[in-house]
């Protein structure tokens, strides 16, 4: 069962819409356990092995690889046919005010955003699953950390995550054998760690989905698929084909040796090897249709290659197209009996959209000037980070905002780009020629960037709906967004700015630009961190949620949502690892229901 076209579809147990972290994990789990799966992807086929510019330097790219409207993260970024604006696929914002706008990032390619993402892989902690119980705000999840912990273990072992167990509050340790050794800290990391700890801020090894050593292909397959010899053999062979990272290139380009997690190198190859997975690319799903009993029969799509309409049928449907795209499909799956869309008897579909709170500060550190030339390429992203450390003060109401953030930071002498040189202008005072070269050598590697990533509390004002007038190039109605930050988020962003400046000062450095005291100005626009979740939240009550704790729609028993749309809260931990853990758990539930002939 390989890549297929719209005319060659067979009979399937499950249709999975989407091929990124959620779709990849869902399809992998189902196929490895014997279910017949059709994956449908809106973008084109993509191969990291042949399309990743692993060893290209910036001078080999147009404009030395700098950002363009078509490539917002630079020419060498892995994203194809994607970005905040996709030609022919508009979306609408109700507000013209920057504070009320939502920027929607999409990647129209096999593997979706997993080809591009930062690979930060944090577990939600016990507080994160029951936030309302702690402070009375937002929603609790219909499951706790203990229920998801075994799936966090499995995902970490499968994809490969480096990190360490530090025993910190609400920052769960992994089970023995799950984590790979973290990479060696850079000089700037050690300096940040030393000075931040003087301020009471813990700095520990980061957790990222990058192989610092080869996976144990002898032990891990038995833990991942107990009692399934066929699956064990397939994944053992696949693990042997993934090489450890040798620090060749930024992870955002993708990886031709499989050293970081992309669904295109980790989930899809072994799932295809089972013979149970078909993949249909360039097919835009726009509707889930039902049978006379109100059960999902399949999906309708536009074949983007031919422009024709098509259908696919299965015993169950899993939507994993990314939070907003999944909501769009459900809202467009309306009928005379369901004028407000499918799975929307609660009226909550499209509501409680969330992103991560973000803001940044850069500092120049004289202690890091004029260091001897040395290689600090490493795992491209941060080797260390600072988890949230003020739970007690926050619970006592001393901070002015209810939820926390973590700090990602990076410095060091990594491969320079156009941004490296242009970023020195505030220090070089217009120097030119030999003097500029001397300045570049002096200041190169002395910059440290601090990025805050914080929790947004769901609110009634942040939501999406179908625009009544605008359609995309395929004739599919598009989303219209409403967005609003609360004071919890803006005060949090202001706290980030103040904290980053304090760390830079403790390092003996100077801040580039101003420290923004007004959190409403400091906070990044909604959607720009590309961590949007919610819109089809899970819960215990069908009157106030769209799905149960397995992502199973209350209204349609064989319809599942396995992406971030089900999140009822958005912790400061980047959501991808939790998305995959939930998807694995949901897929296990689907398999069990099928064994009992309930689907």
Predicted segments, located by residue:
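Glycine-rich loop(s) and the adjacent beta-strand/alpha-helix scaffold that form part
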Residues: 32, 36-60, 257-266, 273-274, ...
């Amino acid at each position: 069962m390989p890549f297929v076209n719209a005319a060659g579809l067979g009979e399937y147990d499950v249709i999975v819409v989407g091929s990124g972290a959620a779709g990849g994990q869902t399809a992998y789990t189902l196929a490895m356990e014997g279910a017949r799966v059709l994956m449908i992807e809106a973008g084109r086929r993509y191969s990291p092995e042949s399309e990743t510019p692993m060893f290209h330097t910036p001078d080999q790219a147009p404009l030395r690889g700098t950002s363009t409207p078509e490539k917002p993260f630079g020419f060498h970024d892995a994203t194809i046919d994607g970005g905040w604006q996709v030609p022919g696929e508009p979306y609408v914002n109700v507000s013209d005010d920057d504070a009320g706008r939502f920027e929607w990032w999409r990647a129209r390619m096999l593997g979706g955003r997993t080809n591009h993402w930062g690979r930060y892989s944090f577990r939600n902690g016990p507080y994160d699953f029951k936030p309302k119980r702690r402070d009375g705000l937002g929603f609790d999840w219909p499951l706790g950390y203990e229920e998801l912990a075994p799936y966090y273990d499995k995902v970490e072992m499968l994809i490969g995550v480096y990190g360490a167990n530090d025993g910190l509050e609400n920052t769960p340790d992994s089970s023995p054998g799950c984590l790979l050794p973290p990479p060696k800290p850079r000089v700037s990391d050690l300096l940040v760690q030393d000075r931040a700890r003087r301020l009471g801020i813990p700095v520990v090894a980061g957790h990222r989905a990058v192989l610092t050593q080869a996976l144990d292909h002898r032990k891990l397959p038995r833990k991942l698929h107990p009692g399934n010899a066929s699956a064990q053999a397939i994944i053992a062979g696949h693990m042997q084909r993934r090489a450890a990272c040798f620090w060749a290139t930024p992870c955002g380009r993708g990886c031709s040796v499989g050293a970081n997690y992309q669904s295109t190198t980790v989930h899809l190859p072994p799932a295809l090897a089972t013979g149970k997975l078909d993949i249909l690319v360039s097919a835009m799903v726009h509707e889930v249709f039902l049978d006379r009993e109100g059960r999902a029969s399949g999906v309708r799509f536009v074949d983007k290659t031919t422009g024709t309409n098509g259908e696919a049928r299965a015993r169950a449907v899993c939507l994993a197209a990314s939070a907003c795209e999944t909501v769009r499909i459900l809202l467009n799956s309306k009928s005379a009996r369901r004028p407000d869309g499918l799975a929307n008897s609660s009226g909550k579909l499209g509501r409680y959209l969330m992103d991560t709170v973000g803001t940044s500060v850069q500092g120049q550190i004289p202690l890091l000037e004029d260091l001897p030339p040395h290689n600090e390429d490493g795992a491209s992203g941060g080797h260390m980070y600072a988890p949230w450390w003020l739970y007690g003060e926050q619970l006592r109401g001393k901070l002015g905002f209810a939820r926390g953030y973590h700090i990602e930071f990076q410095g060091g002498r990594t491969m320079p780009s156009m941004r490296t040189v242009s970023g020195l202008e505030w220090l070089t005072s217009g120097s030119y020629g030999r003097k500029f070269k001397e300045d570049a050598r002096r200041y190169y590697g002395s910059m440290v960037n601090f990025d805050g990533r914080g929790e947004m509390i769901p609110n009634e004002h942040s939501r999406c709906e179908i625009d009544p007038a605008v359609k995309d190039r395929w004739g599919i109605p598009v989303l219209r967004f409403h967005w609003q930050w609360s004071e919890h988020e803006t005060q949090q962003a202001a706290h980030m700015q103040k904290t980053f400046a304090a760390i830079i000062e403790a390092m003996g450095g100077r801040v580039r630009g101003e420290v923004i005291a007004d959190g409403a100005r400091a906070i990044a626009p909604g959607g720009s961190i590309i961590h949007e979740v919610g819109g089809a939240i899970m819960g215990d009550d069908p009157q106030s949620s769209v799905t149960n704790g397995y992502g199973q729609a209350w209204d349609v028993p064989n319809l599942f949502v396995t992406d971030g749309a089900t999140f009822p809260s958005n912790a400061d931990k980047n959501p991808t690892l939790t998305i995959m853990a939930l998807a694995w758990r949901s897929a296990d539930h689907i398999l069990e229901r099928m064994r009992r002939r309930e689907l």
